[in-house]
């Protein structure tokens, strides 16, 4: 039944002249598209960090933007710098979102992967912020044993 409906729609579109054969792009267009992607400025590590710190320091950030930012940041092949995590934790505190703060710390531990020295370093750098904001680590909450 669906196939018959699709054939009728295709036949009607062809009768009205809406279906045109797609021509292959010319070789010049293919070369141009390749060249267009080879240029552009590359973001330095400092610019990357500043962009994310600014994002999380927005005074009007809401819970959705916080989660979107963290999901995007986690998608990169890196462990975020402590100053980015600090800004994200402060955003969680402004939103009174303790669960997201703990989840951010869990994600940092997960992103560190087999490099066991990264997560303790990040926690060491964030310890003053964690104490100031009253945020417990997943280990302090016993979540690492679950």
Swiss-Prot record:
Segments carrying motif SIFI-degron: 2-16
Chain segment of the transit peptide: 1-37
Positions bearing N6-acetyllysine: 83, 109
CDD domains: Cyt_c_Oxidase_Va
GO cellular component: mitochondrial inner membrane; mitochondrial membrane; mitochondrion; respiratory chain complex IV
Tree of life domain: Eukaryota
A GO molecular-function annotation: cytochrome-c oxidase activity
Chief localization: mitochondrion
Tissue: Expressed in the head of epididymal sperm but not in testicular sperm (at protein level).
UniProt modification remark: In response to mitochondrial stress, the precursor protein is ubiquitinated by the SIFI complex in the cytoplasm before mitochondrial import, leading to its degradation. Within the SIFI complex, UBR4 initiates ubiquitin chain that are further elongated or branched by KCMF1.
Keywords: Acetylation, Heme, Iron, Membrane, Metal-binding, Mitochondrion, Mitochondrion inner membrane, Phosphoprotein, Transit peptide, Ubl conjugation
Pathway of action: Energy metabolism; oxidative phosphorylation
Cellular location(s): Mitochondrion inner membrane
One Pfam family matching this protein: COX5A
Membrane topology per record: Peripheral membrane protein
Subunit structure: Component of the cytochrome c oxidase (complex IV, CIV), a multisubunit enzyme composed of 14 subunits. The complex is composed of a catalytic core of 3 subunits MT-CO1, MT-CO2 and MT-CO3, encoded in the mitochondrial DNA, and 11 supernumerary subunits COX4I, COX5A, COX5B, COX6A, COX6B, COX6C, COX7A, COX7B, COX7C, COX8 and NDUFA4, which are encoded in the nuclear genome.
Family: Belongs to the cytochrome c oxidase subunit 5A family.
Role played: Component of the cytochrome c oxidase, the last enzyme in the mitochondrial electron transport chain which drives oxidative phosphorylation. The respiratory chain contains 3 multisubunit complexes succinate dehydrogenase (complex II, CII), ubiquinol-cytochrome c oxidoreductase (cytochrome b-c1 complex, complex III, CIII) and cytochrome c oxidase (complex IV, CIV), that cooperate to transfer electrons derived from NADH and succinate to molecular oxygen, creating an electrochemical gradient over the inner membrane that drives transmembrane transport and the ATP synthase.
Protein name (database record): Cytochrome c oxidase subunit 5A, mitochondrial
């Amino acid at each position: 039944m669906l196939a018959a409906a699709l054939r009728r729609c295709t036949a009607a579109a062809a009768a009205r002249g809406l279906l045109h054969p797609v021509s292959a792009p010319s070789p010049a267009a293919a070369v141009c598209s390749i060249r267009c992607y080879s240029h552009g400025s590359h973001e330095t590590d400092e610019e990357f960090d500043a962009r994310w710190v600014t994002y999380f320091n927005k005074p009007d950030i809401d819970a959705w933007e916080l989660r979107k930012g963290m999901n995007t940041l986690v998608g990169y092949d890196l462990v975020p710098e402590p100053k980015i995590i600090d800004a994200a934790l402060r955003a969680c505190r402004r939103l009174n979102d303790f669960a997201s703060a703990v989840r951010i710390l869990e994600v940092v531990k997960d992103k560190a992967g087999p490099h066991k020295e990264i997560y303790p370093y990040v926690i060491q750098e964030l310890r003053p912020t964690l104490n100031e904001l009253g945020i417990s680590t997943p280990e302090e909450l016993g979540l690492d044993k679950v």
